[in-house]
Amino acid sequence: FIAVDPVYQKEKLRLTGWQLTKALESWAWDGCNGEPAKVEVYARAAQVELFINGKSAGKKKVKKCRANFNITYQNGEITAVSYDENGREINRYSLHTAGKETVLQVRPEEKTVKPEGLAFIQLQYTDSKGIWKPMEKHNIKVTVENGVLKGLGSPAPYVKGNYTAVSYTHLT
């Protein structure tokens, strides 16, 4: 598993009791080429090697299931390869930069809902291949037919509004 601190984030964020790190599972930081990036690799392995666009960015021992890398962000592909104590590859995991197009994905947790039941639906901006675009900031308004909107939330720290609103405005 690879997680990256938001590359564009200049100000410090306070972590909550629910959040152990501010790193996100994304390599889609549009406009951030050449910026420093902190990468966390989580693995049950002896060591991990990180590759950026096919070139090794170094190898690190894994401590408490995590290895940290400080690298320079480049669009493309980031791959973590984990190795056992004998240097044999045991796993690899990659993230890719998102394409230019932006799509609002609507992903319900369940295909059907019982009467009086709740539907949990994730809204997420991606490219046409489904690669998450965490830097996208747009206004979202939700309308529900044949039901009631019980809450609308976002984990983003820069969002105005509360859980009972029907729309969110992202600050830029």
What is each PLM-predicted segment?
Residues 143-158:
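Short aromatic-acidic-glycine turn motif
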Residues 1-115, 128-132:
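Substrate-binding clefts and catalytic carboxylate motifs of secreted carbohydrate-active enzymes
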Residues 169-172:
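Conserved small/polar residues in nucleotide/adenosyl-binding loops
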Residues 58-62, 157-163:
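Short, acidic Ser/Thr/Gly-rich low-complexity loop/linker segments typical of extracellular
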Residues 134-140:
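Short, ordered, surface-exposed loop/turn motifs in non-cytosolic proteins
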Residues 116-121:
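Short, solvent-exposed loop/turn segments enriched in Ser/Thr/Gly
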